[in-house]
From Swiss-Prot:
Record-listed E.C. numbers: 1.2.1.90
Annotated gene: gapN
Protein name: NAD(P)-dependent glyceraldehyde-3-phosphate dehydrogenase
Catalytic activities: D-glyceraldehyde 3-phosphate + NADP(+) + H2O = (2R)-3-phosphoglycerate + NADPH + 2 H(+); D-glyceraldehyde 3-phosphate + NAD(+) + H2O = (2R)-3-phosphoglycerate + NADH + 2 H(+)
Purpose of the protein: Catalyzes the irreversible NAD(P)-dependent non-phosphorylating oxidation of glyceraldehyde-3-phosphate (GAP) to 3-phosphoglycerate (3PG). It is highly specific for D-GAP.
Matches recorded under NCBIfam families: G3PDH_Arch (NF040869)
Length: 501
């Protein structure tokens, strides 16, 4: 892989590039060296240096004592200019960023390029976040207690925000969390996934080159357990976390009383009504299952089709999944690349076996093709047994979904709402009355009509209910989690309260 922006920052050791952490002012780290393996062939492609406990302490101290003020005191127009310049830098280096995403995250080239472009767009649209920063004026005329007073309500940055990012969008998620934290005047400490931390390092370098205050950002390459010290630290006022529900619950337990954006487990249901365009539904559902090998929180995991169209629908979805080419993502003809690790394939195969043992039938795929490669899979599940299956009860982060024939919309809604997650749902059909009923009753954060769920750059807000998280991400919507209200009350009663000159 090319060093790109990090040339001069990366050192080589035994022919392997070594990426440092960024410690709120300097690149470095004296902790352990952690191997970074490519999911393509499990070869070591880099190492990252984690900071020592003392370096973490010093970094948080810099962010808290200086960095949060550097970010807050920088005029909003200058913050916006920094983010726009960073977008230009990333865009100029698109090929290098995409190459790293292919090698480190195992994304097919087209998906990697798409993620880089999404990061660029997110940075350029930061000005839309500013539309949500306004406050309120409250006259005190309406209660005896507040007569001759008035109040102003304003939003202020919290200080230091911890951005904990997942492996599936290692560039975009880092850029997104940094963007909305910084545009509102916060300093940011980024803890990337240790599976693919390289894109986040490149993003931080682009931001620094664009003029980001050097003491207002940090990148700490820490394994999960060691990262708890960031979350638990009282100098960190908010945590923006994307990852599994289990880890998210641990983050809240360790972090205690502070503000959180939690984008957690998902896996979405897709409901197909009897009057749906079946070609459209099959196309969207298949793509929702296999895109980035199903390693997306908004991937389709449960297909619920009304009885008159069920047979044709699952036949078409199975046909599309069976036609996909699985393999090395560096090959432009490949549709589906590897899962992030062999253990992810193990989990998928165990879930398929569990489904078959409980009455399920594999309609497409179902075979392991290598340590990290697997066929996209559709499993037919009886309506009266599906709730017992791992595929229903848990989010299996892989290209696999179960399909259930339902007698009507109400049964579909009941099965969709029965899962512990509530991120998104898709509904395919033409009957406006039925669609409106689904919109009202589905317990999810977003509903996509005649489309697959896809959060994209967050142009529309996203986030879930139940075990899928709290608060929302998306342009302008994370303001709730990374700022605080401050109320200022003016008293005009009595003589000598105000001096007029």
């Amino acid at each position: 892989m090319r060093a790109g922006l990090l040339e001069g920052v990366i050192k080589e050791k035994g022919g392997v590039p070594v990426y440092p952490s960024y410690l709120a002012g300097e690149w470095g780290g004296s902790g352990q060296e952690i191997e970074v393996k490519s999911p393509i062939d499990l070869a070591t492609i880099a190492k990252v240096i984690s900071p020592s406990r003392e370096e973490v302490e010093r970094t948080l101290d810099v962010l808290f004592k200086r960095g949060r003020w550097s970010a807050r005191d920088m005029p909003g127009t200058e913050r916006l200019a920094v983010l726009r310049k960073a977008a230009d830098i990333i865009e100029r280096n698109l090929d290098v960023f995409a190459e790293v995403l292919v090698m480190n995250a195992g994304k097919p080239k087209s998906a990697a390029v798409g993620e880089v472009k999404a990061a660029v767009d997110r940075l350029r649209l930061a000005e839309l976040d500013l539309k949500k920063i306004g406050g309120d004026y409250i006259p005190g005329d309406w209660t005896y207690d507040t007569l001759e007073t008035e109040g102003l309500v304003r939003r202020e940055p919290l200080g230091v925000v911890a951005a904990i990012t997942p492996f599936n969008y290692p560039l975009f998620d880092a850029v997104n969390k940094i963007t909305y934290s910084f545009i509102y005047g916060n300093a940011v400490v980024v803890k990337p996934s240790i599976s693919d931390p390289l894109p986040a390092a490149m993003a931080v370098k682009a931001l620094l080159d664009a003029g980001f205050p050097p003491d207002a950002i940090a990148l700490l390459n820490l394994p999960g357990k060691e990262a708890e010290k960031i979350v638990a630290d009282d100098r960190v006022a908010a945590v923006s976390f994307t990852g599994s529900t289990e880890v998210g619950e641990r983050v809240v337990k360790v972090g205690g009383v502070k503000q959180y954006v939690m984008e957690l487990g998902g896996g979405d249901p897709a409901i197909v009504l009897e009057d749906a365009d079946l070609d459209l539904a099959a196309d969207k559902i298949a793509r929702g299952i296999y895109s980035y090998a199903g390693q997306r929180c908004d991937a389709i995991k449960l297909v619920l089709a009304e009885r008159p169209v069920y047979g044709k629908l699952v036949e078409e979805v199975a046909k599309r999944l069976s036609s996909l080419r699985v393999g090395d993502p560096r090959d432009p003809t490949v549709d589906v690349g590897p899962l992030i690790s062999p253990s992810a394939v193990d989990e998928m195969m165990a879930a398929i076996e569990d489904a078959v043992e409980k009455g399920g039938r594999v309609l497409a795929g179902g075979r392991r093709l290598g340590p990290t490669y697997v066929q996209p899979t559709l499993v037919e599940a009886p309506a009266d047994r599906v709730k017992d299956m791992v595929l229903y009860k848990r989010e299996v982060f892989a290209p696999v979904a179960s399909a259930v024939e339902v007698k009507d919309l109400d049964q579909a809604i009941e099965l969709a709402n029965g899962r512990p997650y509530g991120l998104d749902a898709a509904v395919f059909g033409r009957d406006v009355v039925k669609i409106r009923r689904a919109v009202r009753l589905l317990e999810v954060g977003a509903i996509y009509i005649n489309d697959m769920p896809r959060h994209g750059i967050g142009y529309y807000p996203f986030g879930g209910r139940k075990k899928s998280g709290v608060f929302r991400e998306g342009i302008g919507y994370a303001v709730e989690a990374v700022t605080a209200y401050k109320t200022i009350v003016f008293n005009y009663k009595g003589k000598g309260v105000w001096k007029y000159e």
